[in-house]
Amino acid sequence: MAIQQLPIELANQIAAGEVVERPSSVVKELVENALDAGATQLILDIEQGGSKRIRIRDNGGGIVKQELTLALSRHATSKIQSLDDLEHIGSLGFRGEALASISSVSRLRLISKPPEQEEAWQAWAEGRDMQVTVEPAAHPDGTTVDIQDLFFNTPARRKFLRTEKTEFSHIDEVIKRIALSRFEVGFQLNHNGKSVRAFPSAQTEKQQLQRLAKICGGGFAEQASAIDAVDGDFHLSGWLVPPEHCRHQGDIQHFFVNGRMMRDKLLSHAVRQAYEKYLPNERVPTFVLYFELPAEEVDVNVHPAKHEVRFHRQRQVHDFILTRIEQALNQLVAIENEQPAMSHQHSYSSQERSSGATSDPYRGASGASFLGERKASGSLLPNAARVPHGNAGAQLSTEPEAKLKAEQNWRVLSVFNDVYALIRNEYSLAWLNLAKVHTECVSKKLTQQLQDGLNGQPLLVPVAVSLANLPGPASQWPQQQLNQCGVVYKIQREQAIIEQMPEMLRQGNVVSGFTDLLTLLTEDAETDQLARWLAQFAGLESYSLTQAEHWLIQWRSQLAESADALQKLPLPGENNA
């Protein structure tokens, strides 16, 4: 057979075999493109595990009309232009293969509007023909990539896809990992029309810890200790879990190099070697780590999916990570082995916590020296005491006749089952239901805010819902009260176009939230009833030690006459009957 140049369509499908392994591969490539474009908010709509549809909307810089066709061709990119750029890659993508490869095995629509362009344009491409059609479209600033019928023209590839649940779980994992690398970006993940994940932009340390708890679990956020080590051009930061609290599965092992998620053997070996002398049998290292170094020190162009890298100074990188993690673990194990007296529950004074002053570079994720509170609180618990679950009255003694006052000098010892804080003062030991406190405090605040009107937040993309699916005729909707709740909408062609919602409803299912809110208002709900309903969306699934301390302060200041969230425990030596 004679040697000949492969047709472009065939070359693209061969490239797709390397880049597009499954729906999650498509999601990874498209999300990375959006982040490279400067997006701060992404909405992902997935259908049937990604095999039917993958739609990703962002508010990034967009693509001008003249470059839409070029964007769907191979080796076309705005990220590098020379060999020197390839040596200093600062973006997540750089090869210019993703869109061309994806469009060769799917039906692809690319819609984009840069801020400087007056109108939006869309480009279509479908399968092997790769014929690109460009036409006008309606779209806000940013880009939408709509992928339908993945592998429709390659049946052999399609039959290797797993079940819908399995494929979506891979997509979910990709989004969680990327969300850990870009705290400043908001992510909304929907599957078959239902909201599955909502990660608001996390700018503050508190918000970042909330995202960490959402992704890795409240237990990780509670147990993990922060590490921050620098040596010349090398910078290692993130969170480590002490050996005795590490997991049996390796599902929380996240390593990022210059913002890029990695599964690199060199890095994994360094972490395992640092843990091995402390790690109990059948447990594996548990961590979220970020390694930063100059771009010219690392080659990311060694793996089709960019999961692996090659370091120019491999030995130095390995030894730096190994020694810094070993130092951190030595300190953590030393702290775990201490048995501090009850009068020294907190390693930091309140003044030190507020100022952030510490000489320990391996500070706890909660802001206090790692695990001092948990070790001490363990010695305070009677054997019969357990975290309350609904009707735990047989194990917990409540004392309504000796009303527990919020103004007493309570302090947090630890957090159990993600929502119960173990607190004590000079006389008492008790559980504080953080979810109840959080909701009550927010409800009280919302009651006051509703009088003046809530500040709504515009939706990245307006949501349309048929009037037939909403209660009552639109002409009878309580317009003024909806505005007071921060809702902005317009009626257009038998649809309500929702443009703005209050913050606590914006992150979930917008249509469901709008419908329920409208129902409440048409039933003339009182302000306090409305506030309680809105407050339930503000609660968290899990609370860190820092958050527990915050809500303890809020409870003392705002709900000083309420002890409903408390359940008292007997102190050691007291009668537990």
Curated annotation (Swiss-Prot):
Origin superkingdom: Bacteria
Composition bias, Polar residues: 340-358
Keyword terms of this UniProt record: DNA damage, DNA repair
InterPro entries per record: DNA_mismatch_repair_CS, DNA_mismatch_repair_MutL, DNA_mismatch_S5_2-like, HATPase_C_sf, MutL/Mlh/PMS, MutL/Mlh/Pms-like, MutL_C, MutL_C_regsub
GO cellular component labels: mismatch repair complex
UniProt entry tagged with the keyword ATP-binding: no
PROSITE patterns: DNA_MISMATCH_REPAIR_1
SUPFAM superfamilies in the record: ATPase domain of HSP90 chaperone/DNA topoisomerase II/histidine kinase, DNA mismatch repair protein MutL, Ribosomal protein S5 domain 2-like
Function noted in UniProt: This protein is involved in the repair of mismatches in DNA. It is required for dam-dependent methyl-directed DNA mismatch repair. May act as a 'molecular matchmaker', a protein that promotes the formation of a stable complex between two or more DNA-binding proteins in an ATP-dependent manner without itself being part of a final effector complex.
Name of the molecule in the record: DNA mismatch repair protein MutL
Species in which this protein is naturally found: Idiomarina loihiensis (strain ATCC BAA-735 / DSM 15497 / L2-TR)
Upper taxonomic lineage: Bacteria, Pseudomonadati, Pseudomonadota, Gammaproteobacteria, Alteromonadales
Gene responsible for this protein: mutL
